[in-house]
Amino acid sequence: RPHTVKDFLSVWKTLERHFYDLNVDFIVGLPLEDGEVISENVRIIEELRPPHVSVYVLEEKEFDNDLRRRLPTEDETIKHFLRFCNALTKAGYRRYEISNWYLAKPSLHNLRYWENRDYLGLGLSAGGHIGWFRYVNVSDLALYQTRLREGKCPHEYAQTNTEEKELKETLFMCLRLMEGCDLEELKEKFSPTLIECYVERLVVDSQYFERCGNRLRLTPLGLLHSASALERLV
């Protein structure tokens, strides 16, 4: 992201004069990141008290060898992430999703997305989900405008899911929530037999998932290694 900390602080001062629901994103695992950087980020949170905070772990993609050498180790990244988690809890934030915390209330938009409910996506690259139909719009502005002028949907991807695929997507997203999935609620939408099949697949011989009454959720270890844990749904 091209902005500096100074840029962010300047924009924040302007925004907080006009808006009350603001979110601040942090990324853990960046090149050259160390304990001092984490301390400064924590200090910013404590000073600004944003209503909502997101802390994401950097996804390693096609980094060249020079950049890869400057990345913190996996153990260091986990240590930094846990430090963020502890600092946010100490500061009065409530964690409601793997990477998201709030002071007074969670993001309703985020909850609708993670609970896999209906939402309409409008504009470039926007995604929507209605019933079992999921789509993503094209990212090219000229193509987007042309499709609309022709009376066509500007979708780059569009698919009506099967029951099994819709269930897998629902589990994949709602398991990111600290509360996990309400299995009884899922049974109103999906086959109970199909649900139990996936629950057994996730829970058996796994340190990552636990079933508590009618809820299925990630364990503390599963939250820390969510990418690996949720691969069982792929």
Give the ranges of each region predicted by the language model:
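Conserved non-cysteine loop/helix-boundary elements of the Radical SAM core domain that shape
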Residues: 1-89
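Conserved, mostly hydrophobic/aromatic
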Residues: 25, 45, 53, 96, ...
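Flexible glycine/acidic-rich beta-alpha junction loops that bind and position SAM and/or redox cofactors
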Residues: 28-35, 50-73, 95-111, 125-135, ...
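Hydrophobic, secondary-structure "cap" segments at the distal end of domains
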Residues: 111-115, 123-206, 210
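Self-splicing inteins and homing endonuclease
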Residues: 103-104, 116, 213-216
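Short glycine-aromatic motifs
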Residues: 88-94, 209
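Short, amphipathic alpha-helical interaction segments positioned at domain boundaries
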Residues: 221-234
